[in-house]
């Protein structure tokens, strides 16, 4: 491969970083030339980036004597250069991206940020000499502060190397705790990411960083509390395994899931009469009515409604809400995001609603009984959790614990095939949809008028390679796909979105 060292961002700000290009073809031991497996390589890219960042921190600590703050997502600010105003003054690209989102009336979201990065991307200036750029940076608003900081640095390159030992390296339990805080199952690369994040400057020499990380990963995966959840195959017998195909979990994660299943499947006999839920032409299909009668009349503490996009979730929950109200029940809506929570009352699927974070704020030290009392939950409460696939496992457990203490019922609504919780272990919805005997799924798609398009949406949802290809072929045949430059397509999409929203449509 070839490594390129860059010192600036596309906007000409100081931004030291590296690019590595690997040849797609490699000469193998048997003399044959083969292509690299791009999927496996891509899977390892983030872990490699974390090791790179840890190595850079170590080099800067030795060569310049700088200290670093807490590591967040693999990166850490230099202590003394972590003033937000200083960072912002040298972050022209970030300001350009924020300004583009503001100019287009878009809220700050990662998806919009990625679009803005592409649309506002400029050609990098490679003509201006580094000396001229450094002079320009020194004259900037915070240039004097930076010069003063640099002048006070004392290099550590002559200091004796610190011995590597248990006192200076993260323990396997620390690494695994950091991993499972974000995911229920994980790969070797996931463990490598966290191991590199947790290595403090001064503990490992730059030359030994990679081998040290590999050793920490071996130790973490070799603990008694780590379980393999996929069959292990010998590379000598089967060399077709891709990186990341081997998945692991921990005893703590399994125990948490089992506890959630035990609570959800407890028989509480809080079901109510659901005779009022009947099919209505154009509003509620027979299958939707059957599903809601099963949910409303269920004797289990929890119910699950698997609801793919466009399957009539709102109209179904409206019917259930009416039946609960007729039985004297109060329906509380919970959701992982404010946007999802806000529409629950407006769409008449709940009597009140809030985010899960707001519901449980300030309750960390309370017992489930006290939390239930604080929220006003009791035997006449039905808690409907929307977008449940995006709810973390710990939050799901808290909802179940509180409902159990209150004698309330819980209904989890969502699609296990859609996005999971952000940076938090999840997957409980999928598990409960299999474990609850009366879990229901809304299988009909109503959002699209064209029957073929409804079927294509199901193929995309499943995510299997063959099904995705079938969906893409359908979209291509029916002129749903348009080609062009990334910028042009994004501009067209944004223009279409503006036109729809200006007309009061959902887009």
Q: In which residue ranges do the predicted regions lie?
A:
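Conserved helicase motor core of P-loop NTPases
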Residues: 259, 267-275, 290-291, 405, ...
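Conserved P-loop NTPase motor core of helicases/translocases
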Residues: 330-402, 431-434, 443-446, 453-483
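Conserved RecA-like ASCE P-loop NTPase motor core of nucleic-acid helicases/translocases
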Residues: 303-348, 411-413, 478-486, 493-507
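Beta->alpha loop/short-helix hinge microenvironment recognizer with preference
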Residues: 1-301, 306-311, 315, 320-326, ...
